[in-house]
Amino acid sequence: MHKLKSAQKDKVRQFMACTQASERTAIYCLTQNEWKLDEATDSFFQNPEAFHRESMKSSVDQKKLEQLYSRYKDPQDENKIGIDGIQQFCDDLSLDPASISVLVIAWKFRAATQCEFSKKEFVDGMTELGCDSTERLKALLPRLEQELKDPAKFKDLYQFTFTFAKNPGQKGLDLEMAVAYWKLVLSGRFKFLDLWNTFLLEHHKRSIPRDTWNLLLDFGNMIADDLSNYDEEGAWPVLIDDFVEYARPVVTGGRRSPF
């Protein structure tokens, strides 16, 4: 705040007291509203998340971010980070590449496909998150993972995962890949996850279409422990119909569970 005039510093303090926003957000919001305190506070309360995000973006050192990108970029193609660079990035963050945390980062970067980031995805993604170092990103991760408690944000991550995980030229997601990602994203969220995966590997053995992937989340959210509220006449994919038929005897004790 040392570069601000005395009157501006007063407004920053008043803005922070009124909104509980950070100093950085206060300065950004006041600057955007020509230092008019009332207008700035009104704007902030209409969309606090946006102002927080923009103030974070404005704090990123783009030169530092370019240097960070250079650490990871593919030696053969400077416009992307390949699998070796992703591994180094994960090592710097002390993360397992197969962890939910790395998937959350890819989601925030809006990555098109697994095992690589384009330069634009990496630079824009880090800027959007207000990060120009792996240390800042690591510190931010717990808050990003907290966002998944919001059902709408989790649904967005879940639907993103299908496109991210599949081969770019294919419409469906290979079964083994689908099972691996379901274990990652639905563990602790879908009560029939193990039974579903067993059913698929034993009886389906084909790729998973997008609508089946997307609707499984809705199915998992609404289905009763004994499957009694399943509507066979509902607009569920055939694969989910077949699963319910397979699973009912297991969950109601009609035959022994494989678990």
UniProtKB/Swiss-Prot annotation:
Pfam families: Cullin_binding, UBA_4. Transmembrane segments: none annotated. This is DCN1-like protein 2. Its main location: cytoplasm. The lineage of its organism: Eukaryota, Metazoa, Chordata, Craniata, Vertebrata. Interacts (via the DCUN1 domain) with the unneddylated cullins: interacts with CUL1, CUL2, CUL3, CUL4A, CUL4B and CUL5; these interactions promote the cullin neddylation and the identity of the cullin dictates the affinity of the interaction. May also interact with regulators or subunits of cullin-RING ligases such as RBX1, RNF7, ELOB and DDB1; these interactions are bridged by cullins. Interacts with CAND1; this interaction is bridged by cullins such as CUL3 and strongly inhibits the neddylation of CUL3. GO terms for molecular function: cullin family protein binding. The DCUN1 domain, also known as PONY domain, mediates the interaction with different cullins. The DCUN1 domain mediates the interaction with the N-terminally acetylated NEDD8-conjugating E2s enzyme leading to the NEDD8 transfer from N-terminally acetylated NEDD8-conjugating E2s enzyme to different cullin C-terminal domain-RBX complexes; the neddylation efficiency correlates with the DCUN1D5-cullin and DCUN1D5-E2 interaction affinities. Residues 60-248 form the DCUN1 domain. GO terms for biological process: positive regulation of protein neddylation; regulation of protein neddylation. Contributes to the neddylation of all cullins by transferring NEDD8 from N-terminally acetylated NEDD8-conjugating E2s enzyme to different cullin C-terminal domain-RBX complexes and plays an essential role in the regulation of SCF (SKP1-CUL1-F-box protein)-type complexes activity. Highest levels of expression are in the skeletal muscle with relatively lower levels of expression in the heart and brain. Very low levels of expression in the kidney, liver, spleen, lung, ovary and testis. One of its GO terms (cellular component) is cytoplasm. Residues 8-45 form the UBA-like domain. It is found in: Cytoplasm; Nucleus. It comes from Mus musculus. The modification Phosphoserine is found at residue 55. Keywords: Cytoplasm, Nucleus, Phosphoprotein, Ubl conjugation pathway. InterPro entries: DCN-prot (IPR014764), DCN1-like_PONY (IPR042460), PONY_dom (IPR005176), UBA-like_sf (IPR009060).
